[in-house]
Amino acid sequence: MAWIWISLLLPILIYFPGCFSESEEERLLNHIFVERGYRKELRPVEHTGETVNVSLALTLSNLISLKEADETLTTNVWVELAWYDKRLAWDMETYNNIDILRVPPDMVWQPQLILENNNNGVFEVAYYSNVLISSDGFMYWLPPAIFQTSCSINVNYFPFDWQNCSLKFSSLTYNAKEINLQLRQDLDEASQRYYPVEWIIIDPEGFTENGEWEIVHIPAKKNIDRSLSPESTKYQDITFYLIIERKPLFYIINILAPCVLIALMANLVFYLPADSGEKMTLAISVLLAQSVFLLLISQRLPETSFAIPLISKYLMFIMVLVTIVVVSCVIVLNLHFRTPSTHAISERMKEIFLNKLPRILHMSQPAEPEPEPWSGVLLRRSSSVGYIVKAEEYYSVKSRSELMFEKQSERHGLTSRATPARVNPLNANNSQDQLYGEIKPAIDGANFIVKHIRDKNDYNEEKDNWYRIARTVDRLCLFLVTPVMIIGTLWIFLGGAYNLPPSLPFPGDPFIYTKEHRRLI
């Protein structure tokens, strides 16, 4: 019979051991939460007027991103909370020297701290880890969280900027008379004195560095608004500050360098000849390229009217300058294609644009042709003009018969007279008038040809002068635009390069909020 009872009780002993025995932790939990009648809705104080001290610390694991367009800072942190709840204390000897209990956070009282300046509607932590309870009633809670906080972006010096973001914690349930928010205090082993942890804790082994932002200052501070009553929930808060500086290399390579190179291409417009027809095409192409970059920058930054980013100032400066280049191209092309039949060049204009400015701008000038031996004839004329003049002189001293048979005599080998025939002056004058009347149509035709050639040369010379004026204006614009572009570029970007973060976290406060400069209590 005994073995029958054993076979019946053995499965029960295996599968239901709790029916016959209870662990020390279970007895302790039952004693604290059931027998004592623990109520998590009540503050852990013996008297109503007492204040619960809640210490807070923040450990930064990763600065994930800062989205300028949304003005949102995303961080991965560990929120460290600690307080005392004497209702949960116990005698370690009674419970087999158990010194720590781990319970879910919804079983105990919490100070209900929230992130005030969140930007996504999530006020609490992401994961509710267990709360550690010590035998003396000390409560320690270290939940992880990924916070998205609102961060006001100062775009003045983008991309050579620095930002001051913060994580502000407060309790919207309890006022300053009910809970006292304070920074965590650690013990200085050398002096055996406590000091507040007035900075964000960064574990070098667990911290992941951000590729765009560099952390400069990480102070932590308790803020008290003296203008409010301690009974207000906004009277006190603990704020952790992140002063970060942008690493501009990404923007220099991908935005600034292309912008500067494309802007310098605007100077090539002045080297293109006007006859090529590509001056306007190149200038407008540069203008459109800068417009595309300005559009890309506007999508990256917040829509604000309080400040203009540094890169936007530069792009606007270049766009205005390229617009001036386009206008100068229009003027140069207008001057280049002018003709004497539509426009006349004044003497003052010739003096300025053909003599003075070319010498100042060190422009090469065409060599002046040497004048011909006779006056009254155009410098650039046909050689036939000289023959006509010589013919008139020749006919005036030769008799008509000599003129008729001179060529035949030369053809048959006869020599002509060395001296001209002497004729009666009266007969000579009559003969000359008769000869002039016969050759007058030929002389008129020759004069017409000379006049036509002279007019054509004058026309071409005037047109060449317009070409030279257009070239002078083109060179003048080059000498004006290039220095303005270089000086403006250096002035804008050097102003951003000297925009350094502050040497101290708070203006007027000489304290450096680091562990090396901790303040002992």
Curated annotation (Swiss-Prot):
Any one GO cellular component localisation term in the record: synapse
Signal sequence range: 1-21
Residues carrying Phosphotyrosine: Y394
Annotated catalysed reactions: K(+)(in) = K(+)(out); Na(+)(in) = Na(+)(out)
All ranges on the Cytoplasmic side of the membrane: 336-475
Single GO molecular function: acetylcholine-gated monoatomic cation-selective channel activity
Transmembrane segments: 248-272, 280-297, 314-335, 476-494
Primary site of residence: membrane
Localization per record: Postsynaptic cell membrane; Cell membrane
Cited PROSITE patterns: NEUROTR_ION_CHANNEL (PS00236)
Pfam family, one: Neur_chan_memb
Positions of disulphide bridges: C151-C165
Swiss-Prot/TrEMBL GO biological process terms: acetylcholine receptor signaling pathway; chemical synaptic transmission; membrane depolarization; monoatomic ion transmembrane transport
Glycan-bearing residues: N53, N164
CDD domains: LGIC_ECD_nAChR_D, LGIC_TM_nAChR
Topology, Extracellular side: 22-247
UniProtKB keywords: Cell membrane, Disulfide bond, Glycoprotein, Ion channel, Ion transport, Ligand-gated ion channel, Membrane, Phosphoprotein, Postsynaptic cell membrane, Receptor, Signal, Synapse, Transmembrane, Transmembrane helix, Transport
Recorded topology in the membrane: Multi-pass membrane protein
InterPro entries assigned to the protein according to its UniProt record, in alphabetical order: Neur_chan_lig-bd, Neur_chan_lig-bd_sf, Neur_channel, Neuro-gated_channel_TM_sf, Neuro_actylchol_rec, Neurotrans-gated_channel_TM, Neurotransmitter_ion_chnl_CS, Nicotinic_acetylcholine_rcpt
Domain of life of the source: Eukaryota
Gene3D superfamilies with a match to the protein in the record: Neurotransmitter-gated ion-channel ligand-binding domain (2.70.170.10), Neurotransmitter-gated ion-channel transmembrane domain (1.20.58.390)
Similarity comment text for this entry: Belongs to the ligand-gated ion channel (TC 1.A.9) family. Acetylcholine receptor (TC 1.A.9.1) subfamily.
Subunit structure and binding partners: Pentamer of two alpha chains, and one each of the beta, delta, and gamma (in immature muscle) or epsilon (in mature muscle) chains.
Reported function: After binding acetylcholine, the AChR responds by an extensive change in conformation that affects all subunits and leads to opening of an ion-conducting channel across the plasma membrane.
Protein known as: Acetylcholine receptor subunit delta
Taxonomic source organism: Xenopus laevis (African clawed frog)
